[in-house]
Structure formats: C-alpha cells, structure tokens
Amino acid sequence: MAALTLQSVKKTYDGKQFVLHGIDVDVADGEFVVMVGPSGCGKSTLLRMVAGLERISEGSISIAGKVVNQLEPKDRNIAMVFQNYALYPHMSVAENMGYALKIAGVDRAQIQKRVNAAAQILELEALLQRKPRELSGGQRQRVAMGRAIVREPAVFLFDEPLSNLDARLRVQMRLEIQRLHARLATTSLYVTHDQIEAMTLAQRVIVMNKGHAEQIGAPTEVYERPATVFVASFIGSPGMNLLEGRVSDDGAVFAVAGNGPELPLAGVVSIGREVAKGREWTLGIRPEHMSPGQADAPHATLTVDSCELLGADNLAHGRWGKHDVTVRLPHAHRPAAGEALQVALPAQHLHFFDPASGRRAN
C-alpha cells in the first residue's frame, strides 16, 4: 500500500485554456477518497492522469513518495476498475482475473493462488470456469474488481464502476466495495457522478466543478458545511434551497429577492461577524431541515404548488419570490396544492454565502 499525492496538477490540451486548475490532494495510505461532480468537471481526466493514460501539463503525481509523471501505466503499481467491465469473452472468469499476471510472467501456481484468494473475497469460487456471457452485470463487475485485486497494487483507481448497473445492483455493489476496502485497506481513488456513491463509500470526498476542487472533506463535513454555493446545490438530493436576498439592518429578517417574503431570523444573526447586517446574501437551507413542527425554530409560510410522494417521505414544492423552494416531509404529511405550509427555519441549519464569490460566510 502507499500514499497518493497530487501537487498543483494542471491539464491543458491547447496550451492556453486549462481544464484542470492546480489540484492539490493527499490520499493517505489505505484511505478511500471519492471524486464527485457533474459531467465535464475534470474528475475522469484527473483519474486518467493518475493512471498514466493522460499526460500532466503541470504539477506532479507521487505514489509511495515516488514521482510517477513520466512512468508508463504498467510501471505505476496501480490497478483500474472501469465502467465497462472489459472482460475477454473467450476466457473464463479465472483466466480473465489472472491474465495480467500471466502477461507479467508470474508463475502459474502464484496466479492460481491469487485468483483463488480474490475469488473467495468476492464470492466468485463457483463461477471461476464460466464465461462472461454466463454472468449477470453484478457478477461481471465483481470479476473486474477481482482482476484488479490479484495484481496487489499500491493504489486502486475506480472510474464510475457502477454506472452500468441497475439501481438494485448499485446498492449491492456499494456494500461489496465497502466490505472489500475494509478487508484490503488499499489506497483508493474513486470517480463518480453519483453523490450517493460518494457519500456512502468515501472517507473523504473531493467535489469537482469546472476543473477546480471546490471542497475536500469528510462526507458529513461536505453535507453539513458546504464551502460554496455549488457544493450546497450539488450535494444532497434534492439540493439545498438557495435564496437570494438581503439581511435587514437590525438582523431580524431576511428579505427574499423577487418580492419574496421576509423570513424571520430570530436568534440567527448572531450569525457572527462574517455575515454583515444590511447587505445582500445568498441564504441556504436544506429541504430536510425545514420540516414543520420544530417548536423552538422560527417559521415562515410556503404555499404548496405540488407534492411528490416518494414512499418513505414526500417533497412539497412552492415558491418564495423568484426562487423554487422544496421541503422534505414525513410520509404521512401530504399537503394539497394551494395549502399554506408553516415551514421551520432553524438557526443551526441556515447557511450564508457571499453572492459575488459563492463562498461560505458563516
């Protein structure tokens, strides 16, 4: 195992415009770090640079303290698991898993030993003689992971490995990857656009946007204290409600822009010196923190436009001024369109962002 270090890593294709803007990341020995972001944010490009499939324009990448910028992928002691399983259709499961070792000249007994050990970890023993066409999608992905495990790499790289699976299989495979990391404790860098994968798998999350690492932190930190408006809107399903407006001169209310209501801030501003009174801010609050019935929190009225019934809970939708607002409600609470909903504004769950920079203020 080994630490993975990225220092001021940049990427440009034309020498003028950068698609990655100085990424600094330290992945500790045995740590599982997930890069998450929308399509085109640079996460897969960065992973390919770590793998050696893309050249680095500036900066350095080190594995186990050794700079690998100029090394070929085969010399970096890494193993990749892709979105596409990339299994040889004419080979058995065992042959697929051991093929890279065979090419590397590892003796047959050692290959068999490693393949059997990986098959036991992944519960593939009964499938070793089958061909890929005889396997389910989840089984094929386990074979792809087994092929990576037998190499005993310093670093695992995962490039959206669950994207081809249906929802049920994704849940199952997330659990299997968690168990796999708990058992092997191999340094891992995982790329996904799915925030659920990021939040459930990661020890730390890197939220990527337009070639920048917007925030790096534990899943709870990224959820509870988003560093930017982008992180607030991207992490969470649905994302945080973000309202443009102005804190009053006395700090008592937040006037929502676009002829929206004045939201009570009783006990809030004491928001601190960072959030000045009498100026414009972007106020954020998550749908799940607005549920009615919180007796000790200020409340405001939201007229319901529609309600989505999700099973375990419901989402009520309305508008304050020019802003769409979503509130997560318990399963039994199903307001009708036109109903006035008294939603909570608990002080500890209000987030203030600078409208110019998008950075967190409080």
UniProtKB/Swiss-Prot annotation:
Pfam families per the record? ABC_tran, OB_MalK
Asked if the keyword Cell cycle belongs to this entry, the reply reads no
Q: Which PROSITE patterns match?
A: ABC_TRANSPORTER_1 (PS00211), ABC_TRANSPORTER_2 (PS50893), UGPC (PS51315)
Q: Which GO terms describe its molecular function?
A: ABC-type glycerol-3-phosphate transporter activity; ATP binding; ATP hydrolysis activity
List GO BP terms, alphabetically. Answer: carbohydrate transport; glycerophosphodiester transmembrane transport
Q: What is its EC number?
A: 7.6.2.10
ABC transporter domain sequence ranges:
4-235
Q: Which domain of life is it from?
A: Bacteria
> SMART domains, per this entry?
AAA
Q: What class of enzyme is it?
A: translocase
Q: Where in the cell is it found?
A: Cell inner membrane
Q: Which residues of the sequence carry a binding annotation for ATP?
A: 37-44
NCBIfam families to which the protein is assigned, alphabetical: PRK11650.1
What is the name listed in the Swiss-Prot or TrEMBL entry for this protein? sn-glycerol-3-phosphate import ATP-binding protein UgpC
